[in-house]
Amino acid sequence: MALVLCASGVLGGSGAAAAPAVPGQGESPGTAAAATVDHVEHFDGSGPAGYRSGVPAAAPDRLVERRRPLAPVERRGDGRVSALQRTGPSAERLDIVLIGDGYTADQQEDFRQDAEAKWADVAAIEPFTSHTGQMNVWTVEAVSRDSGVSGDPAQDVVKDTALGTYFWCDGMERLLCADLTRVDSYARQAPAADIVIVVANSAKYGGAGYNRLTGYPFDGVSTLSSDHDSSSLIAVHEAAHSIGRLADEYDEGESGVYQGPEPEDVNISTYPAQEMADRGAKWHDWLGKPDPAGGSTGTFEGAGYYRQGLYRPTETSLMRDFSVREFNNPSRQGLVDGFERYTHGE
């Protein structure tokens, strides 16, 4: 199966092949794109916590109206697929595909360097590091007429790009949205796709995570900036939601006390430490033990957007704060279990 990172260009590796023509260049968004997508997570840079918003799946009219078809010479590379890493058949792998936005036909070498760097960042974080052999990594060229993306550096900047990526989505400067119908059309050029990461040709901080998607062949989409140091962590964090079925561990966004059932997510719980131990539930095996995210594993109140009623395993981790580049042990196990689900075709 596949994790897709979207970005214009061809990465090195074996097995490069031209894909069929990509649909959607210059076309209006379809019915699926007109719907609002819920559960979009984004980060404004003001603090460690993320936020949730409902945003349109299609680019706004002011961006669509600027679109023009690519010239014949530009279309030759549009949609071309290359393998950055191929370790086995897609039916037995987590397939990761990179496609990007805001790279012109003459900027494919720039994309190649950006994509290689982003994948290296992802692969440097455990448990991805120890399990890269369970992943295929593909790239798909997406040629844009303009360089850069809309909303950078100012809200009124409009660019004609392959995926319609834009800052100031839903009026929020750092929320970097994409046209999911166009993302879908490029992602389908790869042999398989489970998660999509859109790499925007920009140095501006921003991003978004589309989780719990329906009607698409992939399980999630994240967007990030190509030239911002923290952008790779957005991709890792968002991929963890879809692959490991992990919850956010920060506690901003909801008022009051959580009073719902025990969550299915492996890294949050309604049980304080003693009750968790007595029940043999969730991360009871790690309680009191040192954790790679820092300190010892316990039950720390405040998680899943609630300040009270939900507990997380550690004081902080990559599911709570981007200043930490480590997943805690329960989250690592959730990701490893997720890798196994993909490699066994589940």
Q: Model-derived features: where do they sit?
A:
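Secretory targeting and sorting signals
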Residues: 1-21
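Catalytic zinc-binding patch centered on the HExxH motif and its immediate surroundings
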Residues: 148-149, 184-193, 199-221
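Propeptide-to-catalytic entry region of secreted or membrane-anchored zinc metalloproteases
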Residues: 26-186
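Solvent-exposed loop/turn segments at secondary-structure junctions
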Residues: 101-106, 143-147, 202-206, 229-231, ...
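Catalytic Zn2+-binding segment of zinc metalloproteases
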Residues: 239-255
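Short pre-active-site segment immediately N-terminal to the catalytic Zn-binding motif
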Residues: 110-111, 215-238
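Extracellular/periplasmic catalytic domains that process cell-envelope and extracellular macromolecules
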Residues: 88-91, 129-132, 188-193, 292, ...
